[in-house]
Amino acid sequence: MSSTKLISLIVSITFFLTLQCSMAQTVVKASYWFPASEFPVTDIDSSLFTHLFCAFADLNSQTNQVTVSSANQPKFSTFTQTVQRRNPSVKTLLSIGGGIADKTAYASMASNPTSRKSFIDSSIRVARSYGFHGLDLDWEYPSSATEMTNFGTLLREWRSAVVAEASSSGKPRLLLAAAVFYSNNYYSVLYPVSAVASSLDWVNLMAYDFYGPGWSRVTGPPAALFDPSNAGPSGDAGTRSWIQAGLPAKKAVLGFPYYGYAWRLTNANSHSYYAPTTGAAISPDGSIGYGQIRKFIVDNGATTVYNSTVVGDYCYAGTNWIGYDDNQSIVTKVRYAKQRGLLGYFSWHVGADDNSGLSRAASQAWDATTATTRTIQKV
């Protein structure tokens, strides 16, 4: 090989490696927004975030293509431009699916090479046409070993497609993320961690909805970071399970809620965690946004309690009891994430915050926390 060709090759390789390194995420401070929250995009303080998710695009079960409903098109098409007014460097991702999406449609799509290609190609087209910097898949949840295998195949093909599209278009590669169960073990069905780690830029660990009146007859911490008994769900247990299964810590993003759940106590004098209840309070399913919780506390003179053992808050007034995360819980979780070497944190959802109070506390806590060597080791 001539010296000229050798130099050219070295330059090309160096450029490629530099490009790949430059695309590696250094931190994720994120939140989701969705139109039904009725929270104006213009009110998002994007200076508090590195990434914002716009939710949700849909999957057409007949064509297996990603679509945006006509009702959402105006807000989705201007989302990136709007949030970048306050923070030109914030990255946006189009989130596909969601908790109420038909999971059987995703299982069917992922089971066939042709339908996977339809999903992948259309997702890239939609992301580019709407000006998003990436894509996020919220399939809740692959529920069998076969579905998990197909999920892994989908992710690998998705990654190959966005790399190829970036090469052909000359544009920066689209980011790829996924919202996943808090643990890598979904009721004895294991996520394909190798495919997840090699294909996605990061995963959002949904470490919340552990307790709620729809599935728990007693009060409990909806998003406990720790469970002293080591028998129940917690953010720490879920994070450890993912990392011990092989997910790099720097691809894990810890999630927490900007909402809580309200129960009606059976006995107003029994108001701690795991107190008996008669069902949901305040709203039909008991869900209540953080801003509404703050108002409830003031309007009712509610007693507030922070539990440092589980890292969670609750308040009560009469027979109304609410479990949630306040500033201290959020800050503690953010510190946990950084000290253990995680990539960052995300919240659901930005519209439920109270004047950006939780988002501001989270961002400041991350910046003020020093990463330590207390990383979670793979076994």
From Swiss-Prot:
<protein>
    <recommendedName>
        <fullName>Class V chitinase</fullName>
        <ecNumber>3.2.1.14</ecNumber>
        <ecNumber>3.2.1.200</ecNumber>
    </recommendedName>
</protein>
<dbReference type="GO" id="GO:0009753">
    <property type="term" value="P:response to jasmonic acid"/>
</dbReference>
<dbReference type="GO" id="GO:0009651">
    <property type="term" value="P:response to salt stress"/>
</dbReference>
<dbReference type="GO" id="GO:0006032">
    <property type="term" value="P:chitin catabolic process"/>
</dbReference>
<dbReference type="InterPro" id="IPR001223">
    <property type="entry name" value="Glyco_hydro18_cat"/>
</dbReference>
<dbReference type="InterPro" id="IPR017853">
    <property type="entry name" value="Glycoside_hydrolase_SF"/>
</dbReference>
<dbReference type="InterPro" id="IPR050314">
    <property type="entry name" value="Glycosyl_Hydrlase_18"/>
</dbReference>
<feature type="signal peptide">
    <location>
        <begin position="1"/>
        <end position="24"/>
    </location>
</feature>
<dbReference type="GO" id="GO:0099503">
    <property type="term" value="C:secretory vesicle"/>
</dbReference>
<keyword id="KW-0119">Carbohydrate metabolism</keyword>
<comment type="pathway">
    <text>Glycan degradation; chitin degradation.</text>
</comment>
<keyword id="KW-0378">Hydrolase</keyword>
<feature type="glycosylation site" description="N-linked (GlcNAc...) asparagine">
    <location>
        <position position="307"/>
    </location>
</feature>
<dbReference type="GO" id="GO:0008061">
    <property type="term" value="F:chitin binding"/>
</dbReference>
<feature type="active site" description="Proton donor">
    <location>
        <position position="140"/>
    </location>
</feature>
<dbReference type="InterPro" id="IPR011583">
    <property type="entry name" value="Chitinase_II/V-like_cat"/>
</dbReference>
<feature type="binding site">
    <location>
        <position position="99"/>
    </location>
    <ligand>
        <name>chitin</name>
    </ligand>
</feature>
<feature type="domain" description="GH18">
    <location>
        <begin position="27"/>
        <end position="369"/>
    </location>
</feature>
<keyword id="KW-0326">Glycosidase</keyword>
<comment type="similarity">
    <text>Belongs to the glycosyl hydrolase 18 family. Chitinase class V subfamily.</text>
</comment>
<keyword id="KW-0146">Chitin degradation</keyword>
<keyword id="KW-0732">Signal</keyword>
<dbReference type="GO" id="GO:0009737">
    <property type="term" value="P:response to abscisic acid"/>
</dbReference>
<dbReference type="InterPro" id="IPR029070">
    <property type="entry name" value="Chitinase_insertion_sf"/>
</dbReference>
<comment type="function">
    <text>Can hydrolyze glycol chitin and chitin oligosaccharides (e.g. N-acetylglucosamine) (GlcNAc)4, (GlcNAc)5 and (GlcNAc)6. Hydrolyzes N-acetylglucosamine oligomers producing dimers from the non-reducing end of the substrates.</text>
</comment>
<dbReference type="GO" id="GO:0035885">
    <property type="term" value="F:exochitinase activity"/>
</dbReference>
<keyword id="KW-0624">Polysaccharide degradation</keyword>
<dbReference type="Pfam" id="PF00704">
    <property type="entry name" value="Glyco_hydro_18"/>
</dbReference>
<feature type="binding site">
    <location>
        <position position="348"/>
    </location>
    <ligand>
        <name>chitin</name>
    </ligand>
</feature>
<dbReference type="GO" id="GO:0008843">
    <property type="term" value="F:endochitinase activity"/>
</dbReference>
<dbReference type="GO" id="GO:0004568">
    <property type="term" value="F:chitinase activity"/>
</dbReference>
<dbReference type="GO" id="GO:0000272">
    <property type="term" value="P:polysaccharide catabolic process"/>
</dbReference>
<keyword id="KW-0325">Glycoprotein</keyword>
<feature type="binding site">
    <location>
        <position position="259"/>
    </location>
    <ligand>
        <name>chitin</name>
    </ligand>
</feature>
<feature type="glycosylation site" description="N-linked (GlcNAc...) asparagine">
    <location>
        <position position="327"/>
    </location>
</feature>
